[in-house]
Amino acid sequence: TIRGEECSAYWPAGTAAFHVNADIAMAFERYRVVSGDDSIEKECGLAVLVETARMWLSLGHHDRYGRWRIDGVTGPDEYTAVVRDNIFTNLMAAANLRSAVGACTRHPEAARDLGVDNEETAAWRDAADAVYIPYDRELGVHPQCEGFTTLREWDFTENTKYPLLLHEPYVRLYPAQVIKQADLVLAMQWQSHAFTPEQKARNVDYYERRTTRDSSLSACTQAVMCADVGHLELAHDYAYEAAL
């Protein structure tokens, strides 16, 4: 937290996890789409979408090639913190920005009351359209964040005490390809349109070998994506784990 009592065990795993703002924004958008009910959006959702969009624009920047990038964030994987261009964060931020534009279009008077003008919504749209998504062409996979696939491999045969956060210092976890919970895999579930079926399959295979089961939040997403790419036995195992 910025105000009040701190509740995160370690600030890079808490304060830098800006993606939570986009997660909440998505909840408003999905409720509207599924229910067809615009009333909650008008009452409070619009303000959430506008203020989170403003936050994303303050965090991101266009580089010299015109790509919109976000630095210094932590994605869902808390074993990889304060990184550049976490794909889950970037895609969710872009979706948040587009949702804010749509909400302001649906409720123009309420948007004006919040100080939103055409110039601001155009900036949101430009950022979303230019969002940078890293890709490792040599390996044929998406790095969870910029440079992730070049980090040292984690020795899973030697480090067998789980959860790792209770047995290993972060100074060992952060520079390695070891993942607490679904991150890039979660991006493929929540922002499925951004990946081809072939990319999904290669990404699932790559990240499955590097993901611990240190978070109960992960199994349901891994079940969905394993089923999506045809790993049905593994999907069943994860679904069973998620139900426990």
Could you describe each region identified by the protein language model?
Residues 19, 41-42, 69-71, 80, ...:
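Generic, ordered loop/turn and secondary-structure boundary motif
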Residues 41-50, 68-73, 114-115, 237-241:
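Beta-strand segments within the central parallel beta-sheet cores of soluble alpha/beta enzyme folds
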Residues 1-13, 67-86, 142-156, 170-171, ...:
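Carbohydrate-binding/catalytic loop surfaces
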Residues 17, 26, 30-33, 43, ...:
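Active-site core of glycosidic bond-cleaving carbohydrate-active enzymes
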Residues 23, 37, 77-78, 85, ...:
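Acidic side chains
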Residues 1-59, 89-90, 97-100, 104:
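Aromatic-rich carbohydrate-recognition surfaces in CAZymes
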Residues 4-8, 55-119:
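Acidic/histidine-rich catalytic neighborhood
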